[in-house]
Amino acid sequence: MALSISTLNTNGCRNPFRMFQVLSFLRQGGYSVSFLQETHTTPELEASWNLEWKGRVFFNHLTWTSCGVVTLFSDSFQPEVLSATSVIPGRLLHLRVRESGRTYNLMNVYAPTTGPERARFFESLSAYMETIDSDEALIIGGDFNYTLDARDRNVPKKRDSSESVLRELIAHFSLVDVWREQNPETVAFTYVRVRDGHVSQSRIDRIYISSHLMSRAQSSTIRLAPFSDHNCVSLRMSIAPSLPKAAYWHFNNSLLEDEGFAKSVRDTWRGWRAFQDEFATLNQWWDVGKVHLKLLCQEYTKSVSGQRNAEIEALNGEVLDLEQRLSGSEDQALQCEYLERKEALRNMEQRQARGAFVRSRMQLLCDMDRGSRFFYALEKKKGNRKQITCLFAEDGTPLEDPEAIRDRARSFYQNLFSPDPISPDACEELWDGLPVVSERRKERLETPITLDELSQALRLMPHNKSPGLDGLTIEFFQFFWDTLGPDFHRVLTEAFKKGELPLSCRRAVLSLLPKKGDLRLIKNWRPVSLLSTDYKIVAKAISLRLKSVLAEVIHPDQSYTVPGRTIFDNVFLIRDLLHFARRTGLSLAFLSLDQEKAFDRVDHQYLIGTLQAYSFGPQFVGYLKTMYASAECLVKINWSLTAPLAFGRGVRQGCPLSGQLYSLAIEPFLCLLRKRLTGLVLKEPDMRVVLSAYADDVILVAQDLVDLERAQECQEVYAAASSARINWSKSSGLLEGSLKVDFLPPAFRDISWESKIIKYLGVYLSAEEYPVSQNFIELEECVLTRLGKWKGFAKVLSMRGRALVINQLVASQIWYRLICLSPTQEFIAKIQRRLLDFLWIGKHWVSAGVSSLPLKEGGQGVVCIRSQVHTFRLQQIQRYLYADPSPQWCTLASSFYRQVRNMGYDRQLFIIEPEGFLRNLSTLPAYYQDTLKTWSMVSVLRQGATEGEDILNEPLLYNPSFKTRMLESISIRRRLCQAQLTRVGDLLDFEKSDWVDSQAVMQRMGFLTTRVPHRLLKEIKDTISPDSHTFIDGVLHAGEPRPPWNSSPPDIIIAPKTRQSPQAPPSPNLSQLENFPLTRFHDITRKLLYSLMLHTVHFLALISRYDTIWRRVLNEGERPQWRAFYSSLVPRPTGDLSWKVLHGALSTGEYLARFTDSPAACPFCGKGESVFHAYFTCARLQPLLALLRKLYLQFWLHFSPHVYIFGRPVSRDNKEKDLLSNLLLALAKLVIHKSRKQCLEGGNPLPAEVLFRVLVRSRIRAEYTQAVFTGRLKEFADQWAIDGVLCSVSPDLVSVQTILTLPYLSAL
């Protein structure tokens, strides 16, 4: 079903004729839903509208002269209207409707014309939208009276405060401007006014929809409305019924926890081995065997599901019955039984939701404390995002019929994957002079693939990936590899001999993922091959072999898939070239090549020939031939599959080998470019740059514009050899310096050339000193969008869960650009504040530094952006100093570093004192300024003595190893820099085979006498060790090596910089700087670097506070066992409570009394309620503490106030008992919290010790039910029946011990 939506500012409809005009216009358009603004309607006019319009009409009036919005439904659109709300009089009308099983929120908006009033309006709109269920779709149309895109207005307009509010609203609620999304380059307007000879045009009328509905949007148009100075904007989108089932079966990994299932699989496969002789080939036997496994899994799942549903139904009936019996009853025993049954039902609901969690791939959701509608909402949004509801045919005709859409997709990919003829001459030209694999590595590649290699490949494969057509997952193969592995190795050995894999391995499901652009164009869907796991095991094993030789045959300027190279090498190079060109006045052209369907157009014949040109052996080439022999794919369109089609061209995206094969395939083209193009040639620094490549993202660097024509010639050779295509019209470039478009060869003038900014590998780069602001605008929008998507989950997630969302799903989106660019402190602070707001959902109870500490140190591990940026800079220094071979950008970095204070130091900067470079960094680009500022935050210790050629490069200035009186003089240092005498080697005269004499030094330093130079030389010589003197004498005698000298990377240790607290720090505190291990900088890990930076950045905040506020009442001694609060048995929200208790992050009576009229007294005993009182000293808690002490004694464990508050350390030898004891402590705090909350809400809570017994018993019974269901009774007994303290277990019964029996039940 298609839905047509329109929006129009009518300029007033009070006149009956104007009303008739508007309604006739809408009928002609055939719109299902129409949003009208500025209607000037009043209640008296409603009858006229209802008589004239056949469908339903909804009004929101203001006055007969201003505002007014009306929403109309056509008579053919009759959804269920759940609510109609006039939110802001005359300006905002909200309809909540249900259609085809989905709920839509239709919002009609008319924004004010003045900036401040408009900003307040958007703030009110945002606040109201927060109340809407995030599970539901948003469709917002109307007159926004503001534009966000410069293309949407004919004359610039001064920005006002409403812009930032509107941008944040759009990002926060993941809204998409449909017309602009489908028409990214078109300029059109919806409002036109001509007055006094001036024309004002803008596109202020827009329709926004939720981003997950974008794939349903078929078209968006602007239609002239003759009676208004506004035009009508319309949207056509599909409304689908409830989602169908998946296109093919997927194995449910939760079955792997069932011992009965595991035994059935192993027994079935052992029996299947007896049927090998009944098949012509092992390939057939393997394929049919996997079908048997699939059927076994499906039958077992049906059986288990039926049993589980029956259990839940029975438990649900018990709870309903207890609810009826509780009506009007005050029977405490009945209440406890109800709570216990209710808790058991909730736990079972949690387990049932796991299937949804697995498909959503968010392990985070597994940590929620209950099954939630949010799980299913997230899945629905993901499913909608992948749905294709309309495609254009080749002639541009829109196709909406599902069968027509499938035919169009299959036809497109059949054409794409069909090979074209290739030119042998072009191939020979490309292959001529290629580097070859060494004989030693070649021999290794030629050996047969072993079972151990397959096993290693399987171990390295990531989890939670979509399976291939057989439905068997990576987890399935890993679990049953001991059974399946040897058989699969035999199948594979035979397959390689015959040159063909089993059919299930040859076939892939082509899943289409949306890209940017109009999703009605099939080319804007990215094909990813979902391959069977057994195929991926083989591909991974071959990939592990191949990666060891890539660096031998692929040039350093291509970094994709080559070990030791990263994408940042490419970005750093282009970034630094731009800065270098601007500083030196170079004129350069940067041309970014747009390659059309690069991975999908690689010709297989060309690929095999290229491998042979690299001198790969026949056995290894045979492996790759077999991997692609008779390959097929089935296109997945929504929830169906097309008929198979031959995969005759391209490398399979989704295959572990695809990236490596593509790098090998494009390398001959890049080699040809390097041979024929001049590129950029520099003498200082000594380097040549022709291109930078990351997979198919190739950017050419040209000083001579003739290089562009040569590049086109090279591309024509490459296209003839491999079927590759470069779309010159979509390629883009940057002209730096004096170059202009008019200077370019005619064929290149139609390319989109910029003079300031180029986007390369996702980063906006320019020659300006500071990064392009667009980078940070997009990052901020990205953060807001991500947090907005998860905002509905926030209160359901634990703090650990929210921290995981922040670190893995939000902050991780900004790291890429922050590694390459220097963000402002304002940007960092703003994003950090957003992240912490999401973590706390209210008051920030502890500082940002404490929140960022890892859990084991008392924090929640929320990433500190500032510390992470410093870590990135330290990692960049690591790569600069120690990368072997050194990336090209390091040469430019050295050139920049040598300009610092004219000292001529590059690597030597990192062994001198920071004062040597911090005073003046203005000669450096902003990125390298930040790098040196970060370096100044740590202390540097050098290991060992300076020996050999390194002594010649030893710096004289600010060098802790060269502490002389003369070198400490500021004047002497300045003169040495001016004279370019900054290293030991600079003081050697190779012509005289001696040290430079005092007279020469005097002249170069500008002194009038030799007294100071003589003394300076003497002090330097006296500082040098005898061994170094001997080496220098040998160098002078031999006359070599002469400058420039090659020095080895500095062997240094980094340590925290010594800092003093302004006052005596408490002990123990949260700072760990004094315990930081001294580590060689070459070997230090990213994790350790981050820890160092985190404690350095937040030093004062951490050293000035105790590790826990409980030090006020509990003496120094044991430390809190932070990780024990979130151990495997403890529910994460319960762990949050224990964590907050230790930090005092709870609203107690004394705290609230400081800010409100709430009483400070404890609601139970009347004494002052601090966190210490509420959770420890209150008289009502003593029976509970006594019960805990008794339980601990029965476990033969020590119980004390420290253990109760701080938790018990988990030891390896006593792990199960320690985990269980920590759970009891966590549940005790939970019942204290719940009973206190119930009391404050006016209830009559059960005693804390009674509620504790109920919770423990309920947990035991729920765990026992799960253990019986999964066949894991032994594990249950080992965990819960320790020493028989809590319960005893038999195959048919779990008996709870007397200590957990409620006292009043015993009395009864």
Curated annotation (Swiss-Prot):
CDD domains named in the record: L1-EN (cd09076), RT_nLTR_like (cd01650)
Origin: domain of life: Eukaryota
Domain Reverse transcriptase stretches: 494-765
SUPFAM superfamilies from the UniProt entry: DNA/RNA polymerases, DNase I-like
One Pfam match: Exo_endo_phos
Keyword terms: Transposable element
GO-annotated molecular function: catalytic activity
Disulphide-bonded residues: none
InterPro entries membership: DNA/RNA_pol_sf, Endo/exonu/phosph_ase_sf, Endo/exonuclease/phosphatase, RT_dom
Key word Electron transport present: no
Matches recorded under PANTHER family: REVERSE TRANSCRIPTASES
Name the UniProt record assigns to this protein: Transposon TX1 uncharacterized 149 kDa protein
Organism (species): Xenopus laevis
